[in-house]
């Protein structure tokens, strides 16, 4: 019976994976998706260029034009071939409210036109001041960092409407040489060699400019264009089918499908707990394993495309932590069969993957060449994943801590469950401390080879150490009897704030230190602070309930006798 239920869950997961995901499955621009472009230090398909460009400028791969949703390829081709007035389109994402207020823009408006931003003199002053500080190696304010991010979006948009910036013409002989735009190919090749290619490009451009009715005839033209580019330099141009894997990865959306499976497993596990006769535990396990398998496949595809471990920026660390939460929870769940590991892990893994999928302007999903300090694949492959897995362990402990505190708050009489949750939490905290300790030591060794010192009190290093100490204190306190089961639950929730600071705060709030390759902008400090504040109120409520402070207060008030008035 267990095997049958497990198989049912796994089959449901496979069915979900097999369903078409994208709403843009039959675009007439599909033949152009595998057109090879040299950009950002590597060769990538035009489909990837389109998705990255639109996501970076607009904050989403879907753009709504005249109440019609356009996919990234349609929007990018319109930009590239400039078939409408993009100067006036409210296309550029600008969401940082304080900077909008400072430069006189509507703080409630999210998207602005290229023209509106380029002609804003106050914005220009902030950008110039930011560049001056960069030259003098001074720290930038949040406004200045956001202004530079916005400048990058405007620069990218300006470059996207220029034929020469989309490098599709290969170098004649050097596999690492610089490619050219279609209008610059005469600098590399003779007119006779490029004439057929220019003709194919002109036909393609005319088809697109003539309207959507002509796009279905694009297939042979796209084939001629790709064949012509390959014929120019067959030893340099990637082989036929070289871009297929990356295009498949873009459209398969493995991480989105993984969070759907995690979410479904969570719902099934809830039914198992709430509806006792309906024992679907192994079906939930099957769905959860399906999610882990799909996410693992997504990591493998990304590694094949990038040629390195997928843990080099904030986007990759978020999806890796989500994977770590799921994998660690699954391991413990298969050992203890307690249900609570999966119940705590699934929402956290879903949250990580949804955040990574829905915030491309903040968590950049593009695959880029590594900065020099990260090019040692050995240290990159062991230090960063180890640190991220420790964060995953602590996040899982955070989830179990919430389940435990919820029990203290609403069902304090369930003593056996509270004891079990404390034991489960303690095991995860031990794993997290072990991994974080190992990660800090490995990072110190890597720093010694890269920067010539083992420890330099860099903000990232300092906050990692603070996080470790925040977890070591309650673990040792439990050993010597200073804190009990409730204290472990509180510590697993409260101490995660140190992890949040080491992981998010150093990158998006402080933005200083030698770990600059992990920095970013666009994170909402107030939103994070609000979530943390509400979470601490939850901890306080559970503490008040557990300690019985309100009961004692009411009891003391009821025992007081009314005083007598003396004349």
Regions flagged by a language model, labelled:
Residues 19-248:
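Soluble extramembrane regions of membrane proteins in the secretory/endomembrane system
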Residues 237-352, 356-359, 366-369:
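Core alpha-helical transmembrane segments of integral membrane proteins
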Residues 261-266, 319-333, 385-404, 464-478, ...:
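Hydrophobic cores of alpha-helical transmembrane segments in multi-pass inner/ER membrane proteins
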Residues 290-296, 320-325, 349, 429-438, ...:
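Hydrophobic membrane-spanning alpha-helices of multi-pass integral membrane proteins
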């Amino acid at each position: 019976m267990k095997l049958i239920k497990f198989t049912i869950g796994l089959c449901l997961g496979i069915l979900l994976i097999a369903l078409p995901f994208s709403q843009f499955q039959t675009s007439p621009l599909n033949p152009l998706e595998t057109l090879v472009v040299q950009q950002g230090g590597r060769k990538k398909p035009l489909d990837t260029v389109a998705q990255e460009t639109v996501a970076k400028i607009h904050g989403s791969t879907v753009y709504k034009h005249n109440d019609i949703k356009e996919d990234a390829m349609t929007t990018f081709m319109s930009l590239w071939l400039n078939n409408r007035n993009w100067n006036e389109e409210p296309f550029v994402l600008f969401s940082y409210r304080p900077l909008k207020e400072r430069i006189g823009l509507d703080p409630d408006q999210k998207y602005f036109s290229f023209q509106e931003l380029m002609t804003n003199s106050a914005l220009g002053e902030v950008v110039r001041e930011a560049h001056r500080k960069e030259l003098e190696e001074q720290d930038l304010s949040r406004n200045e960092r956001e202004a530079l991010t916005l400048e990058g979006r405007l620069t990218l948009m300006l470059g996207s409407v220029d034929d020469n910036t989309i490098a599709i013409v290969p170098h004649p002989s050097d596999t690492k040489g610089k490619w050219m735009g279609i209008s610059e190919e005469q600098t590399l090749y003779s007119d006779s060699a490029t004439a057929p290619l220019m003709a194919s490009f002109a036909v393609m451009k005319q088809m697109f400019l003539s309207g959507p009715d002509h796009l279905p005839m694009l297939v042979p033209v796209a084939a001629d264009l790709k064949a012509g580019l390959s014929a120019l330099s067959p030893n340099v141009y990637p082989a036929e089918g070289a871009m297929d894997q990356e295009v498949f990865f873009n459209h398969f959306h493995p991480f989105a499908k993984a969070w759907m499976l995690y979410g479904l497993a969570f719902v099934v596990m809830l039914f198992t707990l709430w509806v006792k006769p309906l024992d679907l535990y192994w079906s939930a396990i099957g769905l959860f394993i399906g999610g882990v398998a799909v996410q693992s496949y997504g990591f493998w595809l990304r590694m094949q495309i990038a040629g390195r471990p997928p843990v080099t920026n904030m986007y990759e660390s978020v999806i890796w932590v989500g994977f770590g939460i799921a994998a660690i929870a699954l391991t413990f769940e298969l050992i203890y069969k307690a249900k609570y590991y999966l119940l705590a892990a699934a929402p956290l893994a879903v949250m990580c993957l949804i955040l990574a999928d829905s915030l491309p302007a903040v968590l950049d999903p593009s695959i880029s060449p590594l900065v020099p300090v990260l090019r040692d694949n050995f240290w990159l492959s062991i230090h960063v994943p180890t640190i991220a897995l420790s964060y995953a362990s602590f996040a899982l402990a955070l989830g179990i801590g919430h389940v435990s505190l919820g029990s203290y708050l609403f069902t304090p009489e369930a003593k056996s469950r509270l004891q079990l949750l404390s034991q489960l939490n303690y095991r995860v905290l031990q794993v997290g401390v072990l991994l974080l300790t190992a990660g800090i030591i490995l990072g110190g060794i890597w720093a010694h080879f890269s920067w010539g010192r083992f420890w330099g009190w860099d903000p990232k290093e300092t906050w990692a150490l603070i996080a470790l100490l925040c977890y070591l204190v309650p673990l040792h306190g439990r050993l010597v009897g200073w804190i009990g089961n409730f204290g472990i639950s509180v510590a697993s929730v409260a101490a995660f704030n140190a992890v949040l600071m080491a992981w998010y705060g150093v990158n998006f709030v402080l933005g200083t230190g030698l770990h600059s390759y992990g920095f970013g902008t666009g994170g909402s400090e107030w939103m994070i602070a609000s979530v943390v504040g509400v979470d601490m109120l939850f901890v306080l409520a559970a503490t008040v309930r557990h300690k019985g402070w309100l009961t004692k207060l009411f009891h003391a008030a009821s025992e007081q006798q009314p005083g007598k008035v003396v004349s």
